[in-house]
Amino acid sequence: MLMLNNKIVLPGGAGLVGQNLVARLKARGYTNIVVLDKHRSNLDILRRIQPDVLAEYADLSASGEWQRHFADAKVVVMLQAQIGGNDYQEFVRNNVNATRLILEVVKAHAVPCLVPISSSVVASVADDFYTRTKRDQERMILDSGIPCPVLRPTLMFGWFDRKHLGWLSRFMQKVPVFPIPGHGRYMRQPLYVGDFCNIIISCIENRIPAGIYNISGHEKVDYIDIIRAIKKATGARAVLLNIPYRLFYGLLWLWGLFDKNPPFTTQQLSALIANDEFEVIDWPGGFGVSQTPFAKAIDETFNDPTYGRVVLEF
């Protein structure tokens, strides 16, 4: 049985899922949380919000001092991920090389509970840098011989969302016109990160059996309706304007020439229109957690008095 003072290590824990998970772990009384991440500004935000959490800079793609934190750890939640960008080697370093080193140190210290976070894109028809390296990552985890539940979430949103819906909401509040690619009727299965963190905690506390779990949002929502929901929740005044897909693609391509880490890439646009539909399992029943309705989750995301206004660096 996990004790509240047992060490929980979160590699890559200064991002969307990690910041939310820390908040919820602390709310449940856990006191020995270690976050390892290479995003310095987001580590600073975590230290400011959660001053009693040990948050250290670490490049997980290279061996280093960070590996000592796995000694005596009872739980490791593998959160590190390269999601966006145009440099393939960045995806390899953060999604593949870092995973290899973490698995090695988990084995070396015989950590009893590992919860790796994969992605629904592993089962996608898309073929991009993120999808390829997440497939490699998941294969490496399954071949490691470490029994663990592998979680495959769909597109997530919630507190601390610096990319995805969080970035879209901030962009929407800065511009008079918000462009929508094509007709905008691209089905999504958005997953509230608060629900996903409760699933992770269930894995930790209930020792969920090893296997692959597709964690999809239970509500199918078109991209344009997600944007409308964000506009309503934030009170943004931007006019939503549908523009031809090819023009939208060209503008993103042009943006990528001047920004080495653009918020939205042509590869991500192609994935948006791929029309993937992911398996929906009974994760509320299987993990013993509640599902937050999409409309309520959007409201909590942008209007929570404690975390709704905290913005991570992109």
Name each model feature, range by range.
Residues 170-191, 199-203, 207, 214-216:
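A conserved pocket-lining segment of Rossmann-fold NAD(P)-dependent short-chain dehydrogenase/reductase
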Residues 8-28:
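N-terminal Rossmann NAD(P)H-binding glycine-rich loop of SDR-like oxidoreductase domains
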Residues 139-159, 169:
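Conserved beta-loop-beta element that borders a ligand/cofactor-binding pocket
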Residues 203-264, 278-281, 286-314:
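Mid/C-terminal beta-alpha module of Rossmann-like enzyme folds, strongest
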Residues 53-97, 105, 120-127:
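NAD(P)H-binding glycine-rich loop region in Rossmannoid oxidoreductase-like domains
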Residues 91, 97-133, 144, 149:
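Conserved Rossmann-fold NAD(P)-dependent oxidoreductase catalytic core, especially the SDR/UDP-sugar
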Residues 30-40:
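Conserved glycine-rich Rossmann-like NAD(P)H-binding loop of the short-chain dehydrogenase/reductase
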Residues 11, 36, 76-80, 114-120, ...:
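SDR active-site strand-loop-helix element
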